[in-house]
């Protein structure tokens, strides 16, 4: 049966217009976002006989507490709003694309005054260019090693670059011809940027055109009897030709396309992409998709394209002219219009029927099938172990349900100074690092016990405060035709309660945490402590600990939680200690206020590097004169003695 709190809207309440809808749970978190050409037809289908619904759709409807929707003018607007909401709320019942590994990219930091070429993983930054993804980081380094001879661009970090500027000498790459050394003025910033832009042109698919230009310049230099330059251009052309030959030619020259294939079963699907530029495979990427509802291949392709190209932000170069898919998406025309607007030129979605493109699509499909098989083999053991661990913890602690969300707290201190605490979160037995939190504790007495009481009080006081705000609507000022934004819709730091709280320690720490929860009137959160020495599990109001077998999966999971909380607390404590030590050294110097302290640290990065600097280098910091630099130099070297 449907959850009793979810009211079925009357048919007349739901418009027949295109729009986007949201399901919310009892904690006012968005759990599913969808779009529809006809909202009435789509939403009514969720309230059919539960036995006819896909099992995961049934689970979603059962978990839902309320439903709302927004009308939009066009299907393209619906597609864009659906993507934005999925990105904003991260609903747990929407399809989640998880990379089967963290693929590296070759990043070009065009947003910086002196751009840098680097291996990069993580969220893309506006203004930079990204090439790839590559299967391995060494593949990027091999490519760079070949191309830096032709395009001697900067690859060093900001610290190395500033050091070269200070000492007036480039690094080794400058001396062997693999960097043009803008740090010491061998080329100007404008000349270096042109080198980088030429590199981007070659990586973007214009390698053959650039090679022809090199060969033309080489012949012209030879004709002018400038044999030294001709020899250098010949070597550059050979290096570029070698880099091109390392990439497999799969389609005719000037073909820019993304080739996408899927392999799926009832529960999951693997998606694989080959990125083809200038007829060559420039990179590939794979995802594993959890099928939350009954979706056919056309629907999967639709969802995947929306998320893949929505993810790239405003980088029009990431959207190719042609996208090859095994089955046409469920709304090809809308997708093509949306992608064309993102690219700034026409984009075609095609299903190849014969020839090289069909053969390449079959190759990508084989990769997807292999990825799905490997994923299931790996996950079979992992899922079994995690499920067993959660069941063992449930049984050992006598919990009503398996603890799907566990929070663990640890305190770090050094002789009572810089007391900090950490909160780490595991969901379904896996770390949820976006939910980790750090606490700075000031004026807390009682050692670890007092610190545990303080951090638990702060965490759950915030939880109660944010839960109180969930009924407070916020008008985002976009007008009556735009969706109202609820306060609870936005990600809050502490708005979701855990199934189980673990504290690092024994009976005293557990008692302190229990006292904090009691003071706040919270009685529906399970609590336990894990003592380090004998790995005993302490429960509130029990004189004897619970002992799990040494080889049990449940104990292993609790140890991972405790160790992760300890690592996170220690790293925060070290950072705070380093900051306070730096501040204490500079605070004792006459004439150095907060502004100048920040200027010194921005320029040098650390007190150690300041100690290595000369008076002239200290005086080069903005806002610092010669006299102040001499005072700082004397104070720093006096501190050494």
Curated annotation (Swiss-Prot):
Signal peptide positions (record): none
GO process terms (BP): nucleotide-excision repair; SOS response
The entry's keywords: Cytoplasm, DNA damage, DNA excision, DNA repair, Excision nuclease, SOS response
Chain ranges of the UVR domain: 208-243
SUPFAM superfamilies hit by this protein: C-terminal UvrC-binding domain of UvrB (SSF46600), GIY-YIG endonuclease (SSF82771), RuvA domain 2-like (SSF47781)
Annotated InterPro entries: GIY-YIG_endonuc, GIY-YIG_endonuc_sf, GIY-YIG_UvrC_Cho, Hlx-hairpin-Hlx_DNA-bd_motif, RuvA_2-like, UVR_dom, UVR_dom_sf, UvrABC_protein_C
Transmembrane segments: none
Subcellular localization, as worded in the UniProt entry: Cytoplasm
Coiled-coil residue windows: none
Residues covered by the GIY-YIG domain: 16-95
GO cellular component, as recorded: cytoplasm; excinuclease repair complex
GO molecular function, one term: excinuclease ABC activity
Highest rank taxon of the organism: Bacteria
Function: The UvrABC repair system catalyzes the recognition and processing of DNA lesions. UvrC both incises the 5' and 3' sides of the lesion. The N-terminal half is responsible for the 3' incision and the C-terminal half is responsible for the 5' incision.
Family: Belongs to the UvrC family.
Subunit: Interacts with UvrB in an incision complex.
Name of the protein described by the UniProt record: UvrABC system protein C
Species assigned in the record: Acidothermus cellulolyticus (strain ATCC 43068 / DSM 8971 / 11B)
Gene (name only): uvrC
């Amino acid at each position: 049966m449907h959850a009793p709190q979810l009211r079925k809207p009357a048919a007349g309440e739901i418009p027949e217009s295109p729009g986007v809808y949201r399901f919310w749970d009892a904690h006012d978190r968005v759990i599913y976002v969808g779009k529809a050409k006809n909202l009435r037809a789509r939403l009514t289908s969720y309230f059919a006989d539960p036995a006819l619904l896909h099992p995961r759709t049934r689970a979603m409807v059962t978990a839902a507490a309320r439903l709302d929707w927004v009308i939009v003018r066009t299907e393209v607007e619906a597609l864009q709003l659906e993507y934005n909401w999925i990105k904003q709320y991260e609903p747990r019942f929407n399809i989640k694309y998880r990379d089967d590994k963290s693929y590296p990219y070759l990043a070009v930091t065009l947003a910086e005054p002196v751009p840098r070429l680097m291996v990069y993983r993580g969220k893309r930054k506006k203004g930079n260019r990204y090439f790839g993804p590559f299967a391995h980081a060494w593949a990027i380094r091999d490519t760079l090693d070949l191309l830096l001879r032709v395009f001697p661009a900067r690859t060093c970090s900001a610290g190395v670059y500033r050091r070269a500027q200070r000492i007036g000498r480039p690094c080794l790459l400058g001396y062997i011809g693999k960097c043009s050394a803008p740090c010491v003025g061998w080329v100007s910033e404008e000349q270096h940027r042109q080198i980088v832009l030429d590199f981007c042109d070659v990586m973007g698919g214009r390698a053959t055109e650039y090679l022809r230009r090199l060969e033309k310049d080489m012949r012209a230099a030879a004709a002018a009897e400038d044999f030294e330059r001709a020899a250098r251009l010949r070597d550059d052309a050979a290096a570029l030709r070698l880099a091109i030959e390392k990439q497999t030619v799969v389609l005719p020259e000037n073909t820019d396309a993304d080739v996408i294939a899927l392999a799926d079963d009832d529960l999951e699907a693997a998606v694989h992409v080959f990125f083809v530029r200038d007829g060559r495979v420039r990179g590939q990427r794979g995802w594993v998709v959890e099928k939350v509802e009954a979706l056919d291949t056309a629907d999967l392709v639709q969802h995947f394209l929306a998320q893949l190209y929505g993810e790239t932000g405003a980088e029009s170069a990431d959207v190719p002219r042609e996208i090859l898919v095994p089955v046409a998406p469920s709304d090809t025309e809308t997708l093509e219009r949306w992608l064309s607007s993102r690219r700034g030129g026409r984009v075609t979605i095609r299903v190849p029927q014969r020839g090289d493109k069909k053969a390449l699509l079959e190759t990508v499909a084989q990769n997807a099938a292999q990825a799905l098989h490997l994923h299931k083999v790996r996950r079979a053991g992992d899922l079994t172990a995690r499920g067993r661990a959660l069941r063992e913890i449930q049984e050992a602690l006598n919990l009503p349900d398996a603890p799907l969300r566990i929070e663990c707290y640890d305190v770090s201190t050094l002789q009572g100074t810089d007391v900090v605490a950490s909160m780490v979160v595991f969901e379904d037995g896996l770390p949820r690092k976006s939910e980790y939190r750090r606490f700075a504790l000031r004026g807390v007495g009682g050692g670890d016990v007092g610190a545990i009481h303080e951090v638990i009080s702060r965490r759950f006081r915030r939880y109660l405060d944010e839960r109180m705000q969930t009924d407070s609507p916020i008008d985002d000022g976009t007008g009556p035709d735009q969706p109202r934004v609820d306060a609870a819709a936005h990600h809050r730091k502490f708005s979701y309660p855990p199934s189980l709280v673990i504290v690092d320690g024994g009976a005293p720490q557990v008692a302190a945490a229990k006292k904090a929860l009691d003071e706040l009137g919270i009685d529906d959160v399970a609590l336990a402590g894990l003592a380090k020495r004998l790995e005993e599990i302490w429960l509130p109001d029990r004189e004897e600990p619970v002992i799990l077998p040494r080889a049990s999966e449940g104990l292993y999971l609790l140890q991972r939680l405790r160790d992760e909380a300890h690592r996170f607390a220690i790293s925060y404590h070290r950072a705070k200690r380093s900051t306070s030590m730096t501040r204490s050294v500079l605070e004792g110097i006459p004439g150095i206020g907060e502004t100048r302290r920040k200027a010194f640290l921005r320029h040098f990065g650390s007190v150690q590097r300041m100690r290595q600097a000369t008076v002239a280098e200290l005086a080069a910091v903005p806002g610092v004169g010669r006299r102040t630099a001499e005072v700082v130099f004397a104070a720093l070297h006096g501190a050494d003695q």
